[in-house]
């Protein structure tokens, strides 16, 4: 390629792949496999910028066939639905409810495979309170709360009390940083591949060590 030596600027949203890999790692760490049959439902709390990244990640995960957004600002970010309809290849892949409707949100979360909370610290405490009062029926899905201070969040504690598995924002932070390193060093020489989760499992011993060292450094920085 005669243009190969010409410098170029590329922009990447590493939040997207970071979210996907954080979910994937949680499954692997528990000895589980993610089902690729588009039978899963994802619930996203909020409809701001990070929620957009979360929806993009959901669209790339073959396990997800339906996405529910609990909108804090109904009527804003109207691009979410068209993206879901374009990239999730099922009938009616998107639904939106209001963030303040605790009953509707808990009903969706109870049946969800993945729940993503991208809203600011303490903004989801009312959801945690509603969850704490939701009786004994289990919530079996995986929650990713992007907040990493405090750890765990009130929402994570309530989720775990109902039998669900919850991971904090440090997992997303770690994997988006790992993707950045892979891009900047040329290990991934183009956009993060669509099969990045599988490729992450197939990395070399050196790459495994990189992930371990980055995880250790992150934990030390957050302590």
Locate predicted features.
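Phosphate/diphosphate ligand-binding glycine-rich loop within oxidoreductases
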Residues: 1-29, 150, 158
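Glycine-rich adenosine-cofactor-binding loop
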Residues: 13-16, 23, 27, 31-59, ...
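Short, well-ordered alpha-helices that flank and scaffold nucleotide-derived cofactor binding pockets
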Residues: 21, 25, 56-60, 82, ...
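Adenosine-phosphate binding glycine-rich loop
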Residues: 27-33, 140-142, 146-223
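Conserved hydrophobic helix-helix packing surfaces used for dimerization/oligomerization
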Residues: 41-42, 67, 143
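Conserved S-adenosyl-L-methionine
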Residues: 60-66, 162-165
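NAD(P)-binding Rossmann-fold cofactor-contacting core
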Residues: 63-91
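Rossmann-like adenosine-cofactor binding region
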Residues: 91-167
